[in-house]
Regions:
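Hydrophobic or amphipathic alpha-helical targeting/insertion segments
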Residues: 242-301
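Mobile "lid/hinge" segments at catalytic clefts and subdomain interfaces of large enzymes
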Residues: 353, 358-455
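Short amphipathic alpha-helix segments
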Residues: 213-228, 513-529, 555-556
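N-terminal helical hairpins
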Residues: 38-123, 127
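Terminal amphipathic helices with adjacent charged low-complexity linkers/tails
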Residues: 441-497, 551, 555
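Single conserved hydrophobic/aromatic residue that forms the stacking wall/gate
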Residues: 566-575
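Short glycine-/aliphatic-rich beta-strand segments at the starts of folded cytosolic domains
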Residues: 191-212, 497-513
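N-terminal basic/disordered segments at the start of proteins
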Residues: 132-203, 213-215
Length: 575
């Protein structure tokens, strides 16, 4: 049985695929049960799937009921003839599984159909109450951009072809793919104000810097690239990563390639994937801070697209795979879990995301109890880490569904703080994170991008529905009650702080995250001279890290010379 149900739901007519309730939840969730095929009966009949046609056209419309019953006995278990039309043949249909697959049903749905017990089928009203916005899980119509992503050969074309031509800009199609590689195309309108004609095309490039970490050699490379091939500035963002501006199309490959070869990456810094993972910028070497930073790095790697990374390496460093992500043992182990039912996208090349990736961007952050510098409730996933006395991760409080974005004068978009869902043991955290992402992949709105973030799934369907879907289909580990976190503060880390017994870090304020002119040049000199690393904060400030006890006075003098520290410092600057 697929068939047209001639009783309308609240919003149209459906192709009904009845599946036993228990098997349904285990295999693929409720949304494959009903496939909407029209708002009216006439529209539904015009959109009958190839599977229905293949089954129904083999039967005579006037076939007697007794003959239909006899034919049903020869059909595969779970398929029942209920609509008969358009054929004089009385032979039972063949290749039903292939017909269903051609019609767009998932393997899990087909398997469940073959084992269907009609007595356990659910009804249309129950199903409608469990169907969220248009999404992969309910086979709803999707925006054209979703098909464009699927046709891009894992974010490759037409970007690859257009990198080779002499145009001064990318087409809109290539620009959409360029985002996944960390870049946006922009028009410098100031060019026309200065008397120029036409559009002055240039690229903005965003890096991926988990926990805000920028190794010294990468900072030096960024400074040189921004001066030579950019607009002579760098900008720290509120997601703890650097941006470069003013890059011409003809230079974009050299810029990204140099970044990759200098310990950096721009992969997944933009686009419908997991973005830069945040964590407290302070490089403290005690307490839960090291575990929170490591977890941020592991999340960034485990949620990185895999086949798209191969595309990225091919495009920007000519396929030199030595520059690919070097995942930790925990990441390697959890990547294997991306092939398990529920989490698996159905695409072995891109097991977590699939060829259409996510409906929209996805954001994660980690922190420690008492430190809310990353604003933990404003992310799709927020994790508060708990460690033992040796600093080993024991588990995390988990929050989901936050996000501050909204569209002006559009009430259907809104900011939302994340909901707590419980505490999960540390050894299962990466599995949990990729399970939540898979749920958003399946249930996020694929038709209306302004309504596509995880926060709208939580708002529309509720926390109880979310937890039920998560634990029945994607993540079968135990979720415990939240642990007490204590009071929190919003730390900015400006001034001098002791990093460890022999090391210091100093927080430097930047105006709107902008680095330019003499300050940028001298910071580069300080980083090179003293072999320091850089970390970026959610306040768009900059930390110089790993300053030895014997280096502190010299670094302090150099910073005073460029007015980033003062001769009459605050009490903590006098440390």
């Amino acid at each position: 049985m697929p068939k047209i149900i001639e009783i309308p739901g609240r919003s149209g007519f459906y192709l009904r695929v009845a599946v036993p309730r228990g098997k349904l939840r285990d295999a693929f969730g409720t949304c494959d049960v009903v496939k909407k095929i029209g708002n009216t009966k006439e529209e539904a009949e015009e959109n009958i799937s190839s599977a229905e046609i293949a089954i129904q056209q083999k039967f005579d419309e006037k076939l007697r009921e007794e003959d239909a019953k006899q034919i049903n006995k020869s059909l595969p278990k779970g398929i029942r003839l209920e609509a008969i039309k358009n054929s004089n043949s009385k032979e039972p249909p063949k290749n039903i599984e292939k017909d269903l697959k051609d019609a767009g049903f998932s393997n899990a749905a087909i398997e469940a159909l073959m084992n269907f017990d009609e007595k356990e089928s659910t009804n249309i009203e129950e199903i409608e109450q469990t169907v969220p916005s248009p999404c992969i899980a309910n086979n709803s119509p999707r925006a054209k951009f979703e098909q464009f992503k699927a046709d891009s050969n894992y974010l490759n074309e037409p970007l690859h072809s257009e990198l080779l031509n002499d145009s001064d800009h990318f087409t809109n199609d290539a620009v959409q793919l360029l985002k996944f590689h960390g870049s946006y195309q922009q028009d410098d309108r100031e060019h026309r104000k200065r008397g120029g004609t036409g559009k002055d095309w240039q690229m903005m490039l965003r890096l991926r810097n988990p926990a805000g970490y920028v190794p010294g050699p990468l900072f030096v490379a960024l400074d040189e690239l921004s001066d030579r091939l950019g607009n002579q500035t760098l900008r720290a963002t509120t997601r703890q990563c650097f941006q470069m501006h003013g890059i011409k199309k003809g230079n974009i490959k050299e810029v990204i390639g140099t970044i990759v070869k200098s310990m950096g990456s721009t992969l997944a810094a933009c686009g419908d994937v997991n973005r830069n993972v945040m964590a407290p910028a302070a490089p403290y070497e005690q307490g839960s801070y090291p575990a929170a930073r490591k977890l941020a790095n592991d999340i960034a790697d485990v949620l990185s697209p895999q086949k798209a990374e191969k595309t990225y390496i091919d495009l920007w460093v000519d396929g030199e795979m030595k520059y690919a992500i070097k995942p930790s043992s925990e990441v390697k182990k959890n990547r294997k879990l991306q092939l398990k039912p529920g989490v698996f996208s159905g695409d072995k090349k891109e097991p977590l995301y699939g060829a259409t990736y996510l409906p929209r961007k996805f954001k994660c952050a980690t922190t420690v109890p008492g430190d809310n510098s990353v604003d933990i409730l404003t992310h799709d996933i927020g994790l508060v880490t708990f460690t033992n006395k040796k600093g080993v991760l024991e588990g995390c409080n988990v929050y989901v569904g936050g996000g501050m974005g909204r569209t002006h004068n559009l009430d259907t978009t809104f900011a939302r703080i994340a909901d707590p869902i419980g505490y999960v043991e540390g050894e299962h955290i990466l599995e949990l994170v990729q399970s939540i992402l898979a749920l958003q992949r399946d249930y996020g709105d694929r038709k209306t991008r302004r309504h596509s973030r995880l926060k709208y799934v939580l708002h529309d369907m509720g926390v109880d529905w979310f937890k039920k879907q998560l634990t029945s289909k994607y993540f079968t580990r135990q979720i415990e009650n939240l642990k007490h976190e204590g009071d929190t503060i919003l730390e900015d880390y400006l001034g001098w702080h002791q990093q460890s017994e022999k090391l210091w870090f100093v927080g430097l304020p930047l105006l709107s995250g902008r680095l330019t002119g003499r300050v940028k040049k001298e910071l580069r000199n300080i980083v090179e001279k003293f072999a320091l690393d850089v970390r970026l904060t959610p306040n768009q400030d900059l930390l110089l890290c790993n300053i030895g006890n014997y280096q502190k006075a010299s670094v302090k003098r150099a910073l005073i010379n460029i007015c980033l520290l003062y001769t009459s410092p605050s009490p903590r600057d006098q440390l």
